[in-house]
């Protein structure tokens, strides 16, 4: 590819068009110039490419893919080699669906335990997060797919993430909040970085010269592409000045703003050409990927291996290893409908799903389970169900809020898992409760579950900022206020449409 020749043939309008999305997931192509479209797709622990047209968010409507353990689980393995193997599998699946840029891994530091996307991030340890992220990046990019580390930087909470300001002194910023990104860039060789929604020390991350120019480009030597988080562009011209090459998704105002800025002398056309040069280099790299089918069962087996190697056994009171013939009671909704991932932009529609129920069924006759349906998580109900527990030697407790709160796949999956059964690994086995114990009073409603936290936040915070699963979709659309200002987003369950529209109008950061 003769990049300089291509750039010399481009008009100012074409240059401006190349620096913003064509639709929700892809960049604009220019067949007459030999420039192809790039397709970007979630996500950190599994591909989330939607099944229909590309001009919508597509949550819960994605093509089935392997759901690997989330980053929060994988960090418990401390296994870089395993992380790189998962990265390779992610790269293979992305290439099979002709995805050029995989939006992950995420490695923001876990500063607040209530951050709704903590499951997407590795650790509160910047060194561990960086090493695991670098391994993922190497694996993904070995398959000709670019990895996009996110969210740069200090995006450590979801509450009001579009307008919040992370005020951090320089040493803390570099040693804690940026160290993981530095490792992913220098050791992993990440081709892309996604800028965050929030401000850092008073300036939005997507137009922050200290972050994007002085640290990322000059100090770390990053020569790849910086892309905005979806709807995270505050000022397109200022973003370009700082080296933010690509605004996503498409925005009709961006092209006009860039052209006007060049014509008025507020930005040099050569700066656009520098950004285009990086995008062409990214296109050249991803053009090498091999679009071919992958082995779904092998990838699911790898996901199970990763889950086993990441499991942490907190205590074993003589229960493990299980002996042949042991009868096990499966207690709790998650044994049958597990929460194996979070919600939002990273949700994966899995090709296969291994549940405790299926695993125990596949291990018969060595082991046998005495419960064929979930027993409520309430201790009182467990004790009042002697038929479910009294005949068992052990109880596997899968505590949850309720099965209705679990994330379930949106399309049918294969239920056959017997061929993939291996050694049972569990960190939650315990002896059955004594049935002679005195009756327990029902547990008080305290904010220990997600649902309780949601109710508390709904009462404490303004409408639509409750942080529920639907609210995350709301937060994203709120960031693209200039596109959905009329209220074209889906409101969360904590509000009605009228409140939603007013909230969008009051917090949207888009141009009027």
How would you describe each model-predicted region?
Residues 1-367, 447-512:
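Glycoside hydrolase catalytic-domain context in secreted enzymes
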């Amino acid at each position: 590819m003769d990049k300089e020749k291509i750039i010399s043939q481009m008009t100012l309008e074409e240059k401006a068009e190349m620096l913003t999305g064509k639709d929700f997931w892809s960049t604009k192509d220019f067949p007459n110039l030999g420039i192809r479209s790039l397709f970007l797709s979630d996500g950190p622990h599994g591909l989330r490419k939607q099944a229909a047209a590309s001009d919508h968010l597509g949550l819960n409507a994605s093509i089935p893919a392997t759901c690997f353990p989330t980053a929060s689980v994988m960090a418990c393995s401390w296994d870089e080699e395993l992380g790189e193997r998962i990265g390779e599998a992610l790269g293979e699946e992305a290439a099979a669906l002709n995805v050029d840029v995989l939006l992950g891994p995420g490695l923001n530091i876990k500063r607040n335990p209530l951050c709704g996307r903590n499951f997407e991030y590795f650790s509160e340890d910047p060194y561990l997060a960086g090493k695991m992220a670098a391994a993922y990046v190497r694996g993904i990019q070995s398959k000709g797919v670019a990895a996009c580390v996110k969210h740069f930087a200090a995006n450590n909470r979801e509450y009001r993430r579009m307008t919040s300001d992370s005020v951090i002194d320089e040493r803390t910023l570099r040693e804690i909040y940026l160290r993981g990104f530095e490792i992913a860039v220098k050791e992993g060789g990440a081709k892309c970085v996604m800028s965050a929604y929030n401000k850092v020390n008073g300036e939005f991350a997507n137009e922050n010269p200290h972050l994007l120019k002085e640290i990322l480009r000059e100090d770390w030597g990053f020569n790849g592409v910086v892309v905005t988080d979806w709807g995270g562009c505050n000022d397109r011209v200022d973003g370009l000045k700082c080296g933010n090459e690509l605004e996503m998704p498409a925005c009709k105002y961006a092209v006009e703003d860039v052209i006007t800025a060049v014509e008025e002398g507020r930005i040099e056309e050569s700066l656009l050409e520098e950004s285009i040069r990086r995008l062409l280099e990214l296109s050249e790299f991803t053009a090498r990927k091999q679009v071919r089918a992958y082995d779904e069962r092998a990838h699911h087996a790898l996901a199970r291996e990763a889950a086993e190697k990441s499991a942490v056994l907190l205590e074993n009171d003589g229960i493990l290893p299980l002996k042949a013939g042991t009868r096990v009671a499966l207690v709790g909704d998650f044994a049958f409908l597990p929460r194996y991932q979070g919600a939002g932009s990273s949700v994966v529609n899995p090709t296969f799903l291994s549940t405790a129920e299926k695993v125990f069924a596949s291990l018969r006759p060595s082991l046998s389970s005495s419960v064929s349906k979930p027993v409520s998580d309430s201790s009182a109900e467990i004790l009042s169900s002697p038929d479910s527990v009294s005949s068992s030697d052990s109880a596997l407790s899968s505590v949850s809020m309720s099965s209705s709160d679990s994330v379930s796949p949106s399309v049918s999956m294969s239920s056959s898992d017997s061929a993939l059964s291996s050694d049972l690994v569990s960190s939650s086995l315990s002896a059955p409760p004594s049935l002679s114990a005195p009756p327990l009073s029902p547990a008080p409603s305290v904010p220990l579950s997600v649902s309780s936290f949601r109710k508390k936040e709904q009462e404490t915070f303004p409408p639509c900022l409750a942080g529920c699963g639907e609210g995350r979709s709301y937060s994203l659309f709120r960031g693209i206020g200039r596109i959905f200002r009329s209220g074209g987003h889906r409101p969360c369950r904590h509000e009605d449409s009228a409140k939603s529209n007013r909230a969008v109008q009051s917090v949207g950061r888009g141009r009027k």
